[in-house]
């Protein structure tokens, strides 16, 4: 393994999720083990300090715009995500590790392209990437309930 590309994070909740077991444990497992989601793009990101200085209401507005793009791709079945928080957990001091998973590669790239036009990405990110994209080489069988 190359230490420069070793990334580590933890699942997290935003506070409005009705089922924390699903949000924090079961949904990420379902997504990474779903054989229909054969294409992936993984990348780290670090927010700029400018975002942290915004009022909470402004942060929410910016994140709703950004999240709306992801929800549109997700509700159409094109992109599903796994989001990991990695504040203080890895060498490069990133804030998040994002995994985009889908049945085809093009929508994953299209989603990243579209999100770059949001205020969150275009103004309030210090660092984005490197990107790791490809077809899943192997998946374990999903756990049985």
Where are these regions (language model features)?
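Short S/T/G/P-rich N-terminal loop/turn motif that feeds into the first structured element of a domain
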Residues: 1-72, 103-106, 138-145
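An amphipathic, aromatic/His-enriched active-site/gating alpha helix that lines ligand/cofactor pockets
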Residues: 1-18, 76-80, 103-132
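Short amphipathic beta-strand starts and helix->beta connectors
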Residues: 26-27, 74-85
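Short, well-ordered beta-strand segments in beta-rich or mixed alpha/beta enzyme
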Residues: 40-46, 85, 90-115
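Generic marker of "main functional regions" within proteins
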Residues: 50-55, 95, 110-112, 118, ...
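Short, surface-exposed, charged/polar-biased interaction segments
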Residues: 64, 87, 119, 129-136
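Short terminal or interdomain "cap/linker" segment that borders an active site or interface and mediates
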Residues: 95, 101, 131-141
């Amino acid at each position: 393994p190359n230490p420069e590309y070793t990334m580590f994070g933890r699942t997290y909740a935003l506070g409005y999720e009705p089922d924390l077991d699903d949000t924090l444990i079961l949904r990420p497992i379902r997504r990474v083990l779903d054989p229909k989601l054969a294409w992936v793009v993984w990348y780290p990101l670090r927010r700029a300090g400018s975002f942290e200085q915004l009022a909470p209401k402004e942060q929410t507005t910016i994140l709703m715009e950004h999240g709306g793009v992801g929800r549109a791709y997700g509700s159409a079945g094109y992109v599903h995500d796994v989001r990991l928080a990695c504040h203080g957990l890895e060498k490069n001091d990133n804030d998040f590790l994002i995994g985009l998973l889908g049945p085809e590669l093009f929508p994953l790239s299209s989603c990243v392209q579209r999100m770059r036009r949001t205020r969150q990405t275009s103004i309030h990110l210090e660092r984005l990437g490197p990107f790791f994209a490809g077809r899943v080489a192997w998946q374990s069988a999903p756990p049985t309930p």
